[in-house]
């Protein structure tokens, strides 16, 4: 009999994110209009699971509030003892008959649902004990390196701070996403030790434990390295925001919409634009905007929850909120209107 919920999803969101140099918890920093952890959670929507567990710690109440509209189970990691310890805290929240656990980090807002679904399918099809997502980076600094044998078989992960010079030259890195058989996972976590430079319990150690116990371990190589970008600085935050904005803009342009300097334009995921419309540089469509066909929105205009009927025109630097622009109507430049 097929199980209804063979998979539990665990998202790690307890850390402080000190490199962000912010009082705001790292996973709550906005990327393309919403906290980055919401993007991670959304990427799991296509997986066969109704159990999404968020490990919280730093600013736990704020993280709970940010995800209040999502069906999540929250587990508190009282002490920050490492990623293995974080996953261990989720044990009681996972049903005993659950077969697999997928573990993600709350600071990877670019991860695609397609990659997660492909990884999970491969994990199940190949009857693997552990499937690890990896990728190749030109500059692998700050990432754990993948150590393989001469045949290319995955052996272990070495964290940056524990890597020797030869290991640091390795370009294949740990993307921080795992799919693990539940029964093996919690046996292995009990064996993880903190004998490393950080004195922490590393989740990465389960790879070495799986190999040594002759479990089936495989990698899923992420096709797009930027998809697994971990946001650890304001620079990476800006990069992630730009990438999601451009993904959205490419999607819109493919429907027959023209854009001037698309890298400067922000179109919310809830907004719709008809074909043969022209969007100027620096335009922002916030909330739920409905733009008809043959519309024109000039440079720097900001529309929030607005409707533009076909053939209408909004002038440069106008700011409209909750407005309806009638067919063929033109709103002059620099107008401020709210309804």
UniProtKB/Swiss-Prot annotation:
Q: Which SUPFAM superfamilies match?
A: Nucleotide-diphospho-sugar transferases (SSF53448), Trimeric LpxA-like enzymes (SSF51161)
Q: Which organism is it from?
A: Desulfotalea psychrophila (strain LSv54 / DSM 12343)
* Molecular function as annotated in GO: glucosamine-1-phosphate N-acetyltransferase activity; metal ion binding; UDP-N-acetylglucosamine diphosphorylase activity
Annotated spans, N-acetyltransferase: 256-339
Location of region: Pyrophosphorylase = 1-234
Domain of life of the organism in this record? Bacteria
Any idea of its EC number?
A: 2.7.7.23, 2.3.1.157
What subunit structure does UniProt give? Homotrimer.
Compartments in which it is found: Cytoplasm
According to UniProt, the reaction catalysed is: alpha-D-glucosamine 1-phosphate + acetyl-CoA = N-acetyl-alpha-D-glucosamine 1-phosphate + CoA + H(+); N-acetyl-alpha-D-glucosamine 1-phosphate + UTP + H(+) = UDP-N-acetyl-alpha-D-glucosamine + diphosphate
**Taxonomy of the source species:** Bacteria, Pseudomonadati, Thermodesulfobacteriota, Desulfobulbia, Desulfobulbales
Protein name from the UniProt record: Bifunctional protein GlmU
């Amino acid at each position: 009999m097929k199980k209804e919920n063979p998979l539990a999803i665990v998202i790690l969101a307890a850390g402080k994110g000190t490199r962000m140099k912010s009082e705001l918890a790292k996973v709550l920093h906005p990327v393309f209009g919403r906290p980055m952890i919401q993007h991670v959670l959304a990427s799991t929507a296509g997986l066969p699971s109704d159990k999404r567990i968020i490990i919280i710690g730093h600013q736990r109440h704020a993280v709970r509030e940010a995800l209040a509209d999502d069906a999540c189970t929250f587990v508190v990691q009282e002490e920050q003892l490492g990623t293995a310890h974080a996953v261990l805290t989720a044990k009681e929240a996972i049903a005993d008959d659950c077969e697999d656990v997928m573990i993600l980090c709350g600071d990877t807002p670019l991860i695609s649902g397609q990659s997660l679904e492909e990884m999970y399918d491969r994990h199940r099809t190949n009857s693997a004990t552990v499937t690890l997502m990896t990728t190749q980076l030109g500059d692998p600094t700050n990432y754990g390196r993948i150590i393989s044998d001469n045949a290319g078989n995955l052996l272990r992960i070495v964290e940056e701070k524990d890597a020797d010079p030869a290991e640091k030259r390795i370009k294949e890195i740990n993307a921080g996403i795992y799919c693990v058989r539940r029964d093996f996972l919690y046996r292995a976590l009990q064996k993880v030790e903190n004998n490393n430079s950080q004195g922490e319990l590393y989740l990465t150690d389960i790879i070495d434990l799986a190999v040594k116990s002759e479990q089936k371990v495989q990698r899923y190589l992420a096709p797009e390295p930027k998809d697994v970008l971990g946001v650890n600085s304001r620079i990476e935050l800006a990069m992630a925001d730009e990438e999601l904005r451009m993904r959205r803009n490419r999607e819109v342009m493919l429907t027959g919409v023209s854009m001037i300097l698309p890298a400067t334009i922000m179109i919310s995921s809830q907004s719709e634009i008809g074909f043969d419309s022209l969007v100027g540089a620096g335009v922002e469509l916030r909330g739920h905007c409905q733009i008809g066909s043959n519309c024109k929105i000039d440079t720097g205009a900001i529309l929030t929850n607005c409707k533009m009927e076909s053939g209408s025109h909004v002038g440069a630097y106008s700011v409209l909120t909750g407005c309806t622009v009638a067919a063929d109507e033109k709103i002059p430049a620099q107008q401020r209107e709210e309804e």
